[in-house]
């Protein structure tokens, strides 16, 4: 019996879609909050293989999801490249900034990242041993544009203005940074696969702010390069791409990049995504609005059924359109799973 998640990624249409949730290991779970407190802070948790493996396993024990995703953060890679990274309470991540070619050239090379990231690979090895045999293990990284937005601005921002400014005013420095991140991402994900990940997911959280040719050059092209290299090194490796809020850019994204599955956010309707992206044959992942994990009740049941129904004629992995939030009720996740699996 092949894992349901892998079957969907190979293009099978299943009677019940496999399910996992972005940020399924997170602050909505009391056991996660306890383990994070034990670690001391978020980054300490990411770099502690035993505790990072534990929080990855917690939602699998509680809910029996079809997949587990490595507990880490997309900003561990820029930290390994030499950027300073810290988290401010209530404010999120902060980083040192890169604003010119000198800053890019000061970064470490792609082969120098592994010492800092060694604990992440150890987490992968632990999970490859300890996950239930029916659970698919997903590794991940941020995509170059999204990672670059943090490295340029030093923080998350609503409009990614600093990254757009560098792109438009110092294209050589911007492209050099994108190339550095792209090369390092390939090495990072390759090591995750060697350490036991069965699938990798590429998170381009800010892809939606790239328009027209910029989307092709800085969302599509890096994804294509990363996917081609990973598949050359690891034949048969399934890859999920998530160009969040791409809108019309979702159409043809899998074909252009070589991704096996495109994750869809909830800014588009499941019916639109089924007609334009899935088309009865391409694997899609998504796309329930995370708000229903807070509100629950019949609204959650009906919205869940709508997503399942929209995608039932092609390969589908059920997920949210974005990460589950700290305000979510763990009981609503149980209701979600029961609705999908017909319990």
From Swiss-Prot:
Subcellular location: Cytoplasm
Main location: cytoplasm
Keyword Lyase annotated: yes
Biological process annotations from GO: protoporphyrinogen IX biosynthetic process from glutamate
GO CC annotation terms, alphabetical: cytosol
Site entry: Transition state stabilizer: 73
GO molecular function annotation: uroporphyrinogen decarboxylase activity
Keywords carried by this UniProt record: Cytoplasm, Decarboxylase, Lyase, Porphyrin biosynthesis
SUPFAM superfamilies, sorted: UROD/MetE-like (SSF51726)
Record carries keyword Zinc: no
Subunit structure: Homodimer.
Family, per entry: Belongs to the uroporphyrinogen decarboxylase family.
Role of this protein: Catalyzes the decarboxylation of four acetate groups of uroporphyrinogen-III to yield coproporphyrinogen-III.
Protein name: Uroporphyrinogen decarboxylase
Organism per entry: Cereibacter sphaeroides (strain ATCC 17025 / ATH 2.4.3)
Phylogenetic classification of the source organism: Bacteria, Pseudomonadati, Pseudomonadota, Alphaproteobacteria, Rhodobacterales
Gene behind the chain: hemE
């Amino acid at each position: 019996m092949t894992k349901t998640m892998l079957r969907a990624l190979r293009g099978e249409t299943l009677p019940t879609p496999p399910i996992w949730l972005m940020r399924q290991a997170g602050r909505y779970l009391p056991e996660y909050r306890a383990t994070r407190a034990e670690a001391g802070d978020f980054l300490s948790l990411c770099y502690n293989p035993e505790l990072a493996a534990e929080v990855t396993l917690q939602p699998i024990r509680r809910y029996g999801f079809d997949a587990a995703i490595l507990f880490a953060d997309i900003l561990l890679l820029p930290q390994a490249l030499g950027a300073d990274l810290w988290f401010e309470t209530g404010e999120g991540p902060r980083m040192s900034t890169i604003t010119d070619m000198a800053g890019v050239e000061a970064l470490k090379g792609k082969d120098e990242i592994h010492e800092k990231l060694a604990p992440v690979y150890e987490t992968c090895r632990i999970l490859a041993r300890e996950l239930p045999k029916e659970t698919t293990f997903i590794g991940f990284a941020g995509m170059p544009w999204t990672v670059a937005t943090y490295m340029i601005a030093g923080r998350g921002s609503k409009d990614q203005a600093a990254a757009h400014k560098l792109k438009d005013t110092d294209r050589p420095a911007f492209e050099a940074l994108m190339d550095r991140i792209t090369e390092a991402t390939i090495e990072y994900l390759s090591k995750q696969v060697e350490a036991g990940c069965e699938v990798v997911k590429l998170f381009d959280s800010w892809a939606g702010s790239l328009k027209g040719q910029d989307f092709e050059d800085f969302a599509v092209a890096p994804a294509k390069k990363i996917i081609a290299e990973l598949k050359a090194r690891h034949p048969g490796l399934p890859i999920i791409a998530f160009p969040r809020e791409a809108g019309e850019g979702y159409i043809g994204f899998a074909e252009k990049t070589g991704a096996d599955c495109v994750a869809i956010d909830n800014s588009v309707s499941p019916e639109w995504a089924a007609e334009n992206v899935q088309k009865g044959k391409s694997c899609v992942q998504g796309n329930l609005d995370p708000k229903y994990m807070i509100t629950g009740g019949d609204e959650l049941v009906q919205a869940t059924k709508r997503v399942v129904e929209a995608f039932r004629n092609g390969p589908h992995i059920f997920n949210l359109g974005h990460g589950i939030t700290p305000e979510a009720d763990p009981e609503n996740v149980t209701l979600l799973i029961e609705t999908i699996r017909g319990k």
